[in-house]
Amino acid sequence: MDIENWDTIDQLMADSAQPDFEDWGDLGDLMPDVLPESNGSSSGTATDNDNRCWDHGCNGKKFLNHSNLVRHRRENGSARPRFTCPMCGAYFSRSTARNQHLEKKSCNRVRRYSNGRERPRPRVKD
């Protein structure tokens, strides 16, 4: 394709590439999902209060996401599972912590209560 008059084509492309900004109006009307609302809140986002714990003396402890809050409630709630080391009787709130304790062979020290008395060893089931 041989085009002889490049100046005319360049002028046509330049004219068509200029948008008419006067007809656009407010950008908030065109992009409501991208621009935040004027009052600062956006729909569908979590508020600061959603991931806070007010139970069992936490006084509004804030968590980064909901799953961390759920794990916190499970571990610190009244019906929390306790994982006990079969060697020394240490208590853990997570089975992974108990397993790591066993892998590191941390059972060689005597477990004591906060008052200094030795904690009895757990009974081993036959």
Swiss-Prot record:
Q: Where are the zinc fingers (C2H2-type)?
A: 51-76, 83-115
InterPro entries, per the entry = Znf_C2H2_sf (IPR036236)
Single GO cellular component annotation? Answer: nucleus
| TM region(s), chain numbering | none
- Name the segments for region: Disordered: 17-52, 103-126
What compartments host this protein?
Answer: Nucleus
- Determine if Zinc-finger is one of this entry's keywords: yes
UniProt keyword terms in alphabetical order? Metal-binding, Nucleus, Repeat, Transcription, Transcription regulation, Zinc, Zinc-finger
Q: Name one GO molecular function term.
A: zinc ion binding
Q: What does this protein do?
A: Transcription factor that probably regulates the expression of the gene cluster that mediates the biosynthesis of squalestatin S1 (SQS1, also known as zaragozic acid A), a heavily oxidized fungal polyketide that offers potent cholesterol lowering activity by targeting squalene synthase (SS).
Q: Which family does it belong to?
A: Belongs to the GLI C2H2-type zinc-finger protein family.
Protein name per its UniProtKB record? C2H2-type zinc-finger transcription factor M5
| The organism of origin for this protein | Phoma sp. (strain ATCC 20986 / MF5453)
Taxonomic lineage from the root: Eukaryota, Fungi, Dikarya, Ascomycota, Pezizomycotina
